[in-house]
């Protein structure tokens, strides 16, 4: 426990007692003096808190010292009030035995730690049943504390009640365990402590340990089950202060120690481990105090909006490839992981002393063997006879995990403790062929590789054996898209890949689940998933840097030259398929030509598809959806056809004629003249952009419009397989039509994910929009569709102005505003032979597509298609456009005008000017290059 420097500058109780004596001197009664006493205490509290805050802000006190100082301040306030109550308000010249009273601090306050805005918890201890005077003193004390605006938790119990309740209630038992004498009758408190240990704690060690660990597990489950959540609760979350406190409670309960350092003397922890405990405790208290002071209340969630502020306060500066806030959060996650290590070590020590039972018993044939591969089997868990085995034969560390995987056994905490204490030995076996064989077999095993890799990572073996992986352990990206740290995402992706192989994702990923069994380079696929993000956080293009790392690591892992080249290629181009599918027009022949020029073989295409699917699915909940699956499937099928010698760009005329004949075959019930009329309407690009079923649907819509002479027709059909609602609008074409429709859809809450816009030969506009609701599901509720139809009609008639409606709410949450996304506009005339491709990156908001298309319309550009993607707070919108003459835009001045106009649209909503803030991706690269669905 840190000592408090210059205590009297925080609060001088002796001086306050003197002022109090002066206050009640003369004829004033204690009741009359209460107001002055209260003012005196308020002033002392304010001055004391200000002094502590000043020390913290100036770096003269750390978080632990703040907690101890604030506890000291509260102690003096409680003592002053108690003394005033017993000496002046309700004095007793000769109190009886039964009127004795003691005040104890419990909870965090009992440990002598008080955060800036935490409650103080008090236990009023009685020898017997409560007397009238005791009730009056307690009531006076509490009311004074409440009048001081303190949050007070309290209980009044006799010693017998305390002991009885502690036996039956784990929470009360814990409160009793960490209680601290505060004021009043010390003998009474000592008697309580004696009886608590003799009648409760001394006889219930294993029960208490199991109860607290079960309580911890339930708490972890409630708060997400991972220490790597984006906005962790530093008190209650996994790897937080409460986990450290749980270890402290167990140690105090079993060993009767008051300091973690005492566990070194008991042989439970080494000096180094006790130092790690203290370091973690100090860091978490620093963060917690900053949180409370910034929030101005008792806040323990490390939310997005304060992460950057605390990172700055703790002087985490930006470095190449990592922002200061990312470095801060990485440190936090590493501390949380270290707390997990300490927990395992501690539990192993407890079990060694038979203080607790094994918590897991996994059924396996291995249970009936005394030993397997040189390891002991104890209660279904692999153990070592001596921790020195790992020091003498470090390869045995990897063999332990390999055997556990093959035999489906858990690993004994004692073995994990021995590994932790011999981690340095792993350095010696990085180039050992046997160690690398074991590692590669674990990675590519059909027996739950995800769990094994997670065990290796939790035990810190993974990052030690593969230092490049160690660099991304706890590496996070400060945005709303990447849910997991890089190491968690990677391990999760391996699990997804194995699930694809097993058929667990047949409904979600049907093509990947089919293709994966045709792949010949299975080892290369698994290693590429392992290494695809290995270079994140280094600055530069992590795909290129990762490919270089793959060339170094793969031979070490035992891969052949051919496999190594394949892995390096997959890592280099692991974003290619998602970027192409989500940001390019797959129906444009140039898209497939460019894509196939890089892929070159069907085997690589299959590998890339499965890698992409596993990568996206492992980004976070709800990132993978039916629409993305459909886009990837369409790209895969088009590329496969091209790579296997199917129709190429040169067969364009033949494909157009084939599309027309396919449509005609589906329209036997329509008059031939109606079919011929629709064929005459469509330009060549139209026939290459939809399947026969959609062409037939369009023909029926056009025929219906002609027969009824309606100026506007809106039709929809729900595509459950793609997870979208397809909305087709047939109307007289005019400039800005797309923009107005996009505005009406934004006002209606429909999110456009794709769009194709055609002006037919007869001057009619045939615009198709694929839309979803706010949850990424088809926009299919009847009431919402009716409202959407009405708003489109009102907008096109000039009765509704989307711009005015959208000004009322831009849909950007306060959490989203925390993130700065640099606006960028990229213009490409090589991605298509017929269109100029414009890619706009920036922060997403409601109505963004409306504003962008409105700007494009003002520039007299014709939009042929739009492809919309969002990545958390970031939007990537791609438009295929032509000028008023139906040509690509090529003149530099015109291109600069387009870029400046679109940047102005993005900058008006951005906290940073163009190119000032790094987009979600690696330093120095554009969102277009880096923010992909798979990153």
What name fits each language-model region?
Residues 86-99, 155, 412-415, 455, ...:
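Acidic/histidine metal-binding catalytic segments
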Residues 111-137, 265, 277-279, 283-285, ...:
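Divalent metal-dependent catalytic cores for phosphoryl transfer on phosphate-bearing substrates
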Residues 71-89, 93, 492-503, 736, ...:
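A short, contiguous, amphipathic alpha-helix enriched in charged residues
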Residues 98-104, 110-114, 118-120, 362-385, ...:
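Active-site-adjacent "gating/activation" loops or surface patches in catalytic cores
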Residues 83, 87, 499-514, 533-536, ...:
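Conserved helix-loop functional segments at active or binding sites
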Residues 1-105, 112-114, 118-482, 551:
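Non-catalytic interface/linker regions that flank or bridge core catalytic/transmembrane domains
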Residues 283-284, 323-382, 451, 459, ...:
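Regulatory modules associated with amino-acid/nitrogen control
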């Amino acid at each position: 426990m840190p000592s408090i420097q210059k205590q009297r500058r925080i609060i001088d109780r002796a001086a306050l007692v003197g002022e109090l004596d002066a206050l009640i001197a003369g004829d004033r009664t204690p009741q009359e003096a209460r107001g002055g006493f209260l003012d005196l205490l308020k002033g002392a509290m304010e001055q004391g808190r200000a002094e502590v805050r000043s020390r913290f802000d100036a770096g003269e006190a750390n978080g632990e010292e703040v907690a101890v100082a604030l506890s000291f301040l509260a102690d003096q306030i409680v003592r002053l009030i108690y003394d005033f109550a017993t000496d002046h308000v309700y004095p007793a010249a000769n109190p009886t035995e039964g009127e004795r009273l003691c005040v104890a601090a419990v909870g965090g306050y009992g440990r002598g730690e008080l955060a800036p805005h935490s409650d103080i918890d008090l236990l009023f201890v009685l020898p017997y049943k409560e007397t009238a005077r005791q009730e009056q003193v307690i009531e006076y004390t509490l009311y004074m504390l409440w009048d001081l605006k303190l949050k007070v938790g309290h209980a009044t119990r006799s010693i017998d009640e305390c002991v009885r309740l502690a036996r039956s209630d784990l929470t009360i038992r814990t409160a009793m365990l960490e209680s601290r004498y505060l004021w009043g009758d010390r003998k009474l408190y000592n008697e309580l402590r004696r009886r608590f240990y003799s009648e409760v704690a001394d006889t219930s060690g294993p029960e208490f340990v199991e109860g607290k660990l079960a309580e911890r597990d339930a708490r972890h489950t409630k708060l997400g089950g991972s220490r790597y959540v984006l906005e962790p609760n530093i008190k209650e979350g996994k790897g937080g202060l409460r986990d450290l406190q749980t270890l402290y409670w167990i140690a105090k309960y079993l060993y009767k120690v008051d300091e973690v350092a005492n566990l070194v003397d008991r042989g439970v922890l080494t000096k180094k481990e006790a130092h790690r405990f203290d370091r973690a405790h100090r860091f978490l208290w620093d963060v917690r105090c900053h949180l409370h002071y910034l929030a101005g209340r008792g806040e323990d969630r490390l939310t997005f909006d304060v992460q950057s502020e605390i990172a700055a306060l703790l002087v985490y500066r930006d470095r190449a490839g990592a922002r200061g806030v990312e470095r801060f959060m990485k440190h936090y996650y590493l501390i949380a992981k270290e707390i997990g290590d300490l927990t395992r070590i501690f539990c192993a020590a407890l079990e060694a002393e038979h203080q607790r039972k094994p918590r897991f018993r996994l059924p396996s044939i291995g249970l009936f063997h005394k030993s397997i591969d040189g390891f002991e089997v104890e209660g279904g868990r692999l153990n070592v006879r001596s921790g020195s085995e790992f020091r003498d034969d470090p390869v045995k560390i990897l063999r332990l995990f390999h055997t556990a995987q093959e035999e489906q056994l858990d690993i004994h905490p004692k073995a994990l403790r021995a590994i932790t204490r011999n981690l340095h030995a792993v350095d010696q076996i990085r180039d050992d062929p046997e160690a690398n064989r074991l590692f590669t077999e674990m990675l590519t095993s059909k027996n739950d590789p995800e769990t094994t890799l997670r065990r290796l990572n939790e035990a810190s073996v993974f990052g030690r054996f593969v230092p490049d992986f160690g660099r991304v352990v706890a590496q996070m990206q400060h945005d709303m898209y990447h849910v997991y740290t890089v190491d968690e995402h990677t391990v999760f992706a391996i699990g997804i890949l194995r699930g694809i192989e097993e058929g667990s994702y047949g409904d979600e990923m049907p093509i990947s689940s089919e293709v994966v069994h045709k792949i010949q380079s299975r080892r290369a696929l698994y290693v590429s998933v392992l290494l695809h993000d290995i270079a994140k956080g280094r600055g530069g293009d992590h795909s290129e840097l990762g490919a270089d790392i793959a060339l170094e690591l793969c031979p070490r892992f035992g891969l052949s030259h051919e496999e190594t080249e394949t892995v390096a290629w997959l890592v280099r181009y692991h974003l290619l398929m998602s970027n192409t599918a989500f940001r390019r027009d797959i129906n444009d022949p140039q898209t497939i030509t460019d894509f196939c020029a890089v892929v070159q073989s069907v085997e690589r295409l299959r590998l890339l598809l499965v890698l992409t699917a596993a990568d996206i699915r492992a980004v976070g909940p709800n990132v993978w959806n039916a629409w993305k699956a459909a886009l990837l499937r369409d790209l895969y099928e088009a590329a496969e056809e091209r790579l296997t010698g199917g129709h190429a760009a040169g067969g364009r005329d033949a494909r157009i004629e084939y599309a027309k004949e396919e449509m005609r075959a589906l329209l036997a019930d329509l008059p031939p003249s109606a079919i011929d009329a629709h064929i005459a309407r469509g330009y060549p690009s139209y026939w290459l952009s939809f399947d026969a079923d959609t062409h037939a649907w369009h023909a029926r819509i056009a025929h219906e419009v002609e027969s009824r002479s309606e100026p506007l027709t809106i039709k929809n059909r729900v595509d459950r397989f793609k997870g979208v609602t397809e909305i087709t609008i047939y109307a007289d074409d005019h400039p800005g039509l797309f923009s107005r429709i996009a505005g009406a859809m934004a006002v209606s809450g429909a999110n456009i994910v794709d769009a194709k816009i055609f002006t037919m030969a007869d001057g009619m506009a045939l615009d198709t929009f694929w839309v979803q609701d706010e949850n990424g599901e088809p926009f299919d509720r009847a009431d919402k569709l009716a409202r959407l139809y009405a708003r489109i009609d009102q907008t096109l008639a000039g009765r509704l102005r989307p711009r005015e409606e959208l000004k009322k709410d831009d849909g950007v949450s306060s959490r989203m505003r925390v993130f700065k996304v640099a606006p960028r506009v990229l213009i490409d005339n090589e991605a298509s032979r017929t269109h100029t491709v414009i890619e706009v990156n920036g922060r997403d908001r409601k109505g963004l597509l409306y504003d962008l298309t409105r700007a494009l319309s003002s520039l007299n550009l014709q939009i042929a298609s739009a492809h919309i993607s969002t990545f958390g707070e970031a939007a990537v919108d791609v438009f295929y456009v032509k000028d008023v003459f139906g040509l690509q835009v090529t003149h530099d001045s015109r291109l600069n005008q387009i870029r400046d106009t679109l940047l102005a649209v993005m900058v008006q909503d951005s906290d940073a000017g163009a190119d000032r803030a790094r987009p979600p991706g690696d330093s120095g690269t554009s969102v277009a290059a880096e923010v992909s669905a798979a990153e």
